[in-house]
Amino acid sequence: MLNCCHANTKLIWGPPGTGKTKTVACLLFSLLKLKTRTLTCAPTNTAILQVATRLHSLVMESLEYDTYGLGDIVLFGNGKRMKVYCYPGLGDIFLDYRVKNLMQCFSSLTRWKRTLESMSQFLQDPEKQYFSEIGLKSLEEFLNEKHSHVLSSFCTYKRISRNDDHIMTLEEYVQKLWINIADEYSDKMDNIKSFMTLEQFVKKTFCELSEKLKFLIQTLYTHLPKSFISLATMKKMFRAIELLRSIGISLGPAKFKQTLDASEKERIPSCFLPSNSEIDEFLKILSFLSSSILLPELNGRNQIEKFCLSNACLVLCTVSSSIKLYTEGMTRVKFLVIDEAAQLKECESIIPLQLPGLQHCILIGDEKQLPALVKRKIADSCGFGRSMF
């Protein structure tokens, strides 16, 4: 059928219990593997949820990397009426849930690239991040702000003593000649450090960035179509999560060493030292992910929603909800599958059947099981109760 260019309609008939819904799920699974953009409809929420549940089960059994690939499937409709969260796993393909999660990837506060950069900067120089976070100043900065005359005196001392064998450092000079200022600086720095030590900062910051990065990685490979994330990139994402877990385990109390600066009493995790191979590998992966995953510039819920609907391979909804696919700029649907088509009024069938670009339609149902219901006799006499089946 896919190779036929002419418009085509097929009927699949069968009484209850003959496997119609299972057939639909298998058909959709095959269309997914063929990357054929398909719309699947049903008259009711219950019917479309049954198809979605069967399809989700088939797809999950075939996935090699967690939920990578579910981004090619989207289910949409009224969340409260559908009660999607009563169906295990369907939340991962439900449009409202998908948009909510992707908005966090695109937002300015948790943007994907911003988080990658923050993690990279933190791993390369945690001490610098620590000093910046707590407002810790060097002795020179402290003197420049409050005791500039001491700096001037030290500069004069260095100029006079430039030929001496031993020239005191700024710390030694202040400690010897300005003991009261040295004590003032020491007390101020101790008070600042008492709020959070370097060890505490490293653990806290790594934990926060790690959780945020894991969430973003899992969100992207679950909710973005495969066309945006290649298999090679997916493997790097999985490796990144493994390294996050491994580095996190290394952050134990016995894994800390003195920093290289002998005057510094704080300690830095040994797993963060430059020689650590896991850190080197992780930094390379962060750089790779930053350049390989290019997210579109999307602002607001409506743009992300349209992006998800346009790029999905399989779209599932009720017949009446398919009106949403008439949005300007929407990618065309090639294949239409309608389950429980015998329950569908012919006039209602027109909504998905008028979609531009549609080439093939498959109707599944049993007209003797539960025909379309029309309450008004006038409407019934005019043929509104007739189904295409």
Language-model segment annotations:
Residues K10, P16, T38, I73, ...:
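Hydrophobic anchor at the start of a short beta-strand
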Residues P16, T44, D366:
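Short, conserved phosphate/pyrophosphate- and ester-handling motifs at nucleotide-, phospho-/glycolipid
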